[in-house]
Design a protein with these regions (language model features):
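Long, charged, low-complexity, helical-prone intrinsically disordered regions
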Residues: 1-153
Length: 153
């Protein structure tokens, strides 16, 4: 069961640290280490800001196209599935992604980083910084969301 849990976690969370896995699973550090050791042949280590992150061989992280944009819903696993969110979210923008009461907002993922917020009603996007991604990529992300919503009605 431990091997399966570690495999599923690292397949769906990338990059992730040992601390992230411990926090998400609720298991002791020792058990999480054992699970990670048992799947070590499927994990690659990546250093990000001096911290050791692990990527499962099946994960798409790093394979996204340049200037890729994804509109993520509130409470997306990208934010709630990690103890330390610094790999995807700058400290200065944390309160734009979630508040101190645990309310998470819809966010824009741009090239592996949370780069803004978006509104479902108007399908409008606000970026945290002045630089904006390619307009065609943003339109593609909006169309993907619209297709998803229309498919699931």
């Amino acid at each position: 069961a431990l091997v399966r849990l570690a495999t599923k976690y690292f397949q769906s969370h990338a990059p992730a640290t040992l601390a992230d896995f411990v926090w998400w699973s609720g298991l002791p550090v020792k058990e999480c280490r054992i699970g990670m050791e048992q799947i070590s042949s499927a994990l690659t280590v990546k250093m990000i800001n001096g911290t050791e992150y692990f990527l499962h061989e099946s994960n798409r992280y790093g394979k996204m196209q340049k200037d890729s944009i994804t509109l993520l819903p509130p409470y997306d696993e990208l934010l709630i599935g990690y103890k330390d969110r610094s790999a995807v979210l700058s400290k200065e923008h944390e309160r734009k992604a979630y508040n101190t009461f645990g309310i998470f907002y819809p966010v824009v993922l741009h090239e592996h980083r949370i780069a803004g917020n978006w509104s479902r009603k108007e399908l409008s996007v606000t970026f945290f910084e002045n630089d904006k991604p390619d307009a065609a990529c943003l339109e593609k992300a909006k169309k993907q969301y619209e297709k998803f919503v229309n498919t699931n009605r």
